[in-house]
Amino acid sequence: MLEINDFNAIRISLASPEDIRSWSHGEVTKPETINYRTLKPERDGLFCERIFGPTKDWECFCGKYKRVRYKGVVCDKCGVEVTRSKVRRERMGHINLASPVSHIWFVKGTPSRLGLLLDISPRNLERVLYFASYIIVEVKEDMLQVAREMIQEEYAARRQKIQKQAEEKRIELSTQLTQDLGGMETAQRSTQRQIEEEYRRLRDEIASEAEQLRERLEELSGTLADEDILFRGVTVVEEGEPINENTLDQLDELVEQELEVLEERRRRDLADAELLTDAERERKAYEATQEQERLQERLQRELDHLMREEKEKLEQLDTLKVGRIITETEYRQLRDIAPGVFRADMGAGAVRELIEKTVNLDKLAEELQAEIQSSQGQRRKKATKRLRVVEAFRKSGNRPEWMILTVLPVIPPDLRPMVQLDGGRFATSDLNDLYRRVINRNNRLKRLIELNAPEIIVRNEKRMLQEAVDALIDNGRRGRAVSGKGKHRLKSLSDMLKGKQGRFRQNLLGKRVDYSGRSVIVVGPNLQLHQCGLPKKMALELFKPFVMRRLVERGVAHNIKNAKRAVERVRPEVWDALEEVIKDYLVLLNRAPSLHRLSIQAFEAKLIEGSAIQLHPLVCAAFNADFDGDQMAVHVPLSRKAQEEARTRMLSKYNLLSPAHGEPIITPSQDIVLGCYYLTMVRDGAKGSGKRFSSIDEAMLAYEKHLLDIQAPIWIRMTGTLSGKSDRPVRELPLAADGTPRMLIETTIGRILLNNELQPPLRFRNRLIDKKGLKEIIADCYQYYTNLRNLSEDQLNEVRASHGNKHVQELARIYGSEMTAQQADRIKALGFRYATLGGMTIGIEDIEVPAKKYDIVREAEQLVADVEKQFRRGLITEEERYQEVVRIWQEATKQTIQAVKENLNPFGPVAMMSTSGARGNINQISQMAGMRGLMSDPTGRIIELPIKANFREGLSVLDYFVSTHGGRKGLADTALRTADAGYLTRRLVDVAQDVIITIEDCGTEEGLWLHGADDDELMEKLQVRMLGRILAAPIYHKETGELIADRNTEIDEELATAILASGQESVFVRSPLSCQAEHGLCRLCYGRNLATGKLVEIGEAVGIIAAQSIGEPGTQLTLRTFHTGGVASADDITQGLPRVQEIFEARVPKGKALLAEIDGVVQIVRDEEGVRTIRIVSTDVYTDEYPLGRGFSPTINHESEVYEGQVIAEGPGGAQIVTRLTGKAFIQGDRIIVSQEDHQERELVVPHNARIRVENGERVMAGQQLTDGSANPQELLELQGREAVQRYLVNEAQKVYRSQGVNINDKHIEVIVRQMLRRVRIEDPGDTGLLPGELIDSAEFRRLNNDIVSQGGDPATAATMLLGITKASLNTDSFLAAASFQETTRVLTDAAIQGKVDYLRGLKENVVIGKLIPAGTGIEKRIERPHEDLIGEMARMLEESQQAEEAPAETRRATPLPTPNGNKAPESDNDALLRARLEELLSGDGDNDQSDAEEEDNDLPAF
């Protein structure tokens, strides 16, 4: 039947506003949810029935229309469509946003997709979106020019004005100076006049005084002076001297002198006055000049300032580019400078407008391509990142502006329910709170815009709306997370998807299922291997519907309702019905944790009393179950196909071998082993020892008459051969009459009893059977009966009768499994019986302390005392003392163990339990009877003080305290290890989940060389490693050269023996590592399925098996990165689980080893400070020979230096010989030899604690390890290539597991390593259209290159990438698988932008969308049916449809056919549709149409 779910790919992309509106059934405009009085949804609210559909089936909101007959009617009163209420799980609504908002995934992701597209840094983008900065969205170029001219004109006018003002000031200053100078001239003349007048007055005074004195002297002439006569203070005549003519002359002289002095003073005063005037004049002139200069400077300053201002404004105009981000201040300035020239805005609306106006994807792609070609380094890296986003948009058909939301979808109400609690309060999904915030803010914003509110208020409301939408989509991604009541962070849509509790992991990959139950398990020793005991009460509940149906069929109840009542009342008839229903019905048993596929197996249910599930003891190993309170879950496979699959594939008796290593996992253990060991022991001297019997029957008779002990050695004559070696004497006897070999063997009754229970081909085993021996019996039984050569036609027909006509290999597998299951059950019964009869148990008396122990301890104490003495004397260091003490006590512990071993009674229960492998080992017995020995402290360092006591003697308080360290560490270690191993398994499953066997043969010629085990005892023998592989090349006998086996032959046990016998030490086999299958693997590269021992079938999910095989034993690995002790190697060597993680995550290992970077010779150099350096010197010599023809002579000297292109010889007619090398030339007779040395050196500094592995002068190869430690796989890949790193990873992982005694087949690790190396990084894209640095699947890369080469283009080049499993999982082609693994939001963001198509090739993606997985029986549906089959089916459907039309109305049932748009087509159109499709197919057009449609639109379901 064609189904609407029958599509083969799913696509994710960005939703356009139109898409969101088309999904929606109405706009949500109110934040209300439900009315608290009526408890009915509010109209236009988040739960509105008009938008999302009715809350009750077939009933509208107001109750006008009730019942199904009104189906599809839309109520004219309340507007609700009458339909089923489940539409509320699928109908969406929408909110028209008052202002666009950005989608936070595309803004805040790393890298920010929106930021890359617009070439804006995430910080700036955030500032714009959250209204802190403006972004220019429009610049009017014509207005810009006008603005520029206006600015220039304005500044020119301002300059003119300033210059004019300065000129006026200059004139004013000049006039002032002229006036000042004129005034000074006048003042100077006035001063001169005053001086002249003053001196004239003084002269007159002197003349007047002289005249008066003369007159007096003339009066007194001829007399003696009676006193001194003075003239102006100068004596003219002294007292007593005569006054005469001379006296008058003297007076004239004095007058003359006085007048001269006066004249002198007058001249000086005039000169001083003139000088002062000149100085004042100069001062005034200087001040005027200074003022002029200041004026000039001020003018220049103002002009410069104007120039700068003008330049700045013009520059600001020049920077007015669309997309420029400006602050509030800058915006205001620019608005003032150039009003109306540009438009800047804030928020998501601005960004959306910018995208619509400026982003031309094609043009941008071309520009970025050119930049990648022309630039280097960081610029090129950025351009590549941007181009990746641009190309994603171009190829996907998404529009960049859809990253900004204008319409917000509202998810269906039943996905964000609101439920009433007991107290009348309501519990609601966080999403309702988040939606309510968005609606409130949106409505408020609408109102503010209508009211023309101030810009700042509107802007704030827009920012709050943006934040509300951010919180709804991904709460807490930016800023503080929105919290609800009680500080609890609200769960957003992103939180609904991601993490362990998210939609992917909680609901899509991990659904809870109906028809299941769980209970405690107890052992069911009487069950057969394929049975389990199911408590009746549990079975009745699980099979309730089946029982009810059976009661109605048998007439016990009239209808289902009565039957239900009968079952609930548990009437006696119910048990009979249950017995009938459950007969041959299979149930699945599962024990958590389900670490591998054997954790879920199918069993036939046997009804039992009680409440515990009974489990067969032999399947405990597969489930890792014990009976100390473990619980198991039961599941009922319902459909016929599920039952069939459970029977053919999951039944416990068909799961005998472990998929991890191919050995039996159904291995007897504990009591069974002990019983069989007890049976096959030989006790010399027991009752009847040495007796001889003519046959087995005779010996058994003697045993039954109690004449023999079960363990007594007796001689028996028997026919046939021995299986394997005997541990007792055997004597050959003459052949019997029919040619059968006969012998006389020494054996015991116990061994006869055991062999009686073995299948005839496995007899006669005459040796002590321990756990290993029982495992061999099971393995031999399976191998014998699954080998077609050993089966008769009758045996195969027997299987055919019960299992249908299958392939003979499959029949052999089924027969072998059933025979082995029978064998296991018989051994189980025998083991339990004789463990009981033997009565072996442990008591305190069985633990005997050996007498030797005390001597050993005393001796050790003496040795320790000697060491202490040496230390005190300073002969040894503290570290040496510690090492020696630890060594002494370790040796003492070893000797004690040996003493305990020797002291044990081999027939005692303790020794039997230990040596048989039933329980316990010699170390544990030694702790009870010997000494406990050394313990570790919390850091893992050994405490040098041992516990000398044992548990039999009892521990002292100190002993007990010291041993608690180790105990506690052990518990903590186990808890942590379990979580780590679980996470490792999850990552492994994720990386390999799409590795499925998809094709028969990929045809590759490549393969893997398997070599014989070298000195590494951890590696397995070649015979074991090549078993189940397929030869990649023919193999020949080493000496004779004859063909042993051709290519593509499976290496089975016989062929493996033949290959080794031929002397071959290595084989070239196919491997998952070299498989060329485009998806998954091919059968031949994988080889044998270890769980069946046969070649793997198509559809086997080998990736999951590999992951489980590696992850399941993870808990057995240690967590420690432990100390090797000693100074020689002080580095910690990572081992156990951390080392496995290191390998699979391809991390740089702890204690990394140095690798040689080139081939060459080692020189170890040590400098003065003791730092060691390894120098590798590589010298390659190239020679070129030039014969000298007749007439040629050299133009160079012997041993002279020459360079490439130099003429080294000349001949007749100007002929020349030119050298191709640069080096030294040697002339040897009639030829010239040019030799060139290519010299390379590498230096590596050795860490101080590293041990060097190489010697001075040793020759090393590139990639060779130079120091101890682990190699970095990334370096190894670079130096030695892909094959070397594959080999290294597989071997290193195996070393860790083997060191812990865990056996895993190589091919499982190879599958994981293949996935780690699946991707290549593009270096040069050629003509492929890929991007440099892009990671792409290697198969896809090969396909693209082949296509390009066939079209004559340039192929791309790429480098192999080694990715850790986490990174490889996230780089898978399936976005559903990657999103359900980790980083959900990032994966979905990328996938949406790229418009990714998931072709549903892996398992996870199919589980997520609810399809059958493409593995096992599920792959049969995927293998395309031929064209004719499809036509046949169409024709049959058409015929059925016509018959249905002709049938009476009451018997006719409508079978609507799905139409491509997902709606049901009307019944009457059925045959028209079918007929049209059939005609298309018959005309041969149908296929073409379909393929075209698929090419055009990958997300349409294939019809």
UniProtKB/Swiss-Prot annotation:
Chain positions recorded as Mg(2+) binding sites: D626, D628, D630
CDD domains referenced in this protein's UniProt entry, alphabetically: RNAP_beta'_C (cd02655), RNAP_beta'_N (cd01609)
EC nos: 2.7.7.6
Binding positions for Zn(2+) 2 per the UniProt entry: C1002, C1075, C1082, C1085
GO MF entries: DNA binding; DNA-directed RNA polymerase activity; magnesium ion binding; zinc ion binding
Cofactor annotation: Mg(2+); Zn(2+)
Keyword annotations from UniProtKB, A to Z: DNA-directed RNA polymerase, Magnesium, Metal-binding, Nucleotidyltransferase, Transcription, Transferase, Zinc
Extent of Acidic residues compositional bias: 1486-1503
Superkingdom, natural source: Bacteria
Cellular component, GO annotation: DNA-directed RNA polymerase complex
Residues given in the record as Zn(2+) 1 binding sites: C60, C62, C75, C78
Cofactor comment: Binds 1 Mg(2+) ion per subunit.
Region (Disordered): 1439-1503
Annotated SUPFAM superfamilies: beta and beta-prime subunits of DNA dependent RNA-polymerase (SSF64484)
SMART domains membership: RPOLA_N
Catalysis performed (reactions): RNA(n) + a ribonucleoside 5'-triphosphate = RNA(n+1) + diphosphate
Biological process terms in GO annotation: DNA-templated transcription
InterPro entries cross-referenced by the UniProt entry: DNA-dir_RpoC_beta_prime, DNA-dir_RpoC_beta_prime_bact, RNA_pol_asu, RNA_pol_N, RNA_pol_Rpb1_1, RNA_pol_Rpb1_3, RNA_pol_Rpb1_3_sf, RNA_pol_Rpb1_4
Similarity-based family: Belongs to the RNA polymerase beta' chain family.
Assembly and interaction partners: The RNAP catalytic core consists of 2 alpha, 1 beta, 1 beta' and 1 omega subunit. When a sigma factor is associated with the core the holoenzyme is formed, which can initiate transcription.
Function of the protein: DNA-dependent RNA polymerase catalyzes the transcription of DNA into RNA using the four ribonucleoside triphosphates as substrates.
UniProt-recorded name of the protein: DNA-directed RNA polymerase subunit beta'
Biological source species: Chloroflexus aurantiacus (strain ATCC 29364 / DSM 637 / Y-400-fl)
Organism lineage: Bacteria, Bacillati, Chloroflexota, Chloroflexia, Chloroflexales
